[in-house]
Amino acid sequence: MVHSFLLIGQSNAAGRGKLEEAEPLDTCGGKLKVLRNGRWQTMYRPVNTDRSFSGTCFAESFAKAYSEIHPDVEVGIIPCADGGTRLEQWECGGLLFDNAVNCAKLAMRTSTLVGVLWHQGESDCASERYPFYYERFQKIMRALRQELNIENVPFIVGGLGDFLVNCSILADLENYIYVNEALQRIAKEEKNCAFASAVGLGANPDNLHFSAQALKEFGTRYFDEYQKIVSEEIIDDNAPKENGSIMSEIELL
């Protein structure tokens, strides 16, 4: 049995942790999986290959924490995050939204979708964008739940890093606090939603992306928030599934 999580958002969801700074990936004896070509493979880095320079991501430590609590299942990540994307690019009917829905539906043929992990907002810190973050994201979240029929599945949103005030790559990043306020409001008002704080987490030298060590901690924060709202009925899905695992040695070549 595979319990899966949809990973969506921009670069800090995809992960830009330096591979050389990260501890070796613990796949929990091969129980941690990643969706590739519609099938489950043992997790490897980078988990979310949106760019050639993708790195570690918080989904790694999240999946490990989940596996430790649920050792009788495999834990699969559905990687659909895309770096640098604005909220408007995730709207219902757009390419990113449809890709996430299609990948999730494919994964749901071989797994039980038990959570959505979202991190996005750096690209929406501009003064003409952040005032509308709450309304836009609320529509996206509700549309995603409807498309996948996951009204009761936990949706965890992560805060933007406070190191953004020191970043010179993008303008208006000091407005991250307003995006965080919108995310916290969403988590408070929407059912089965929680906010994972990024306060105090470290960054790469660019002061835009979380460091490998920070991402490891961030994943545990996501999991802690997930545990607070998940219900047993979500994870106790005994509906028959297709076999999406690698079936022969030659497929590993």
Tell me the role of every PLM-derived stretch.
Residues 1-253:
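Cell-envelope and extracellular/periplasmic
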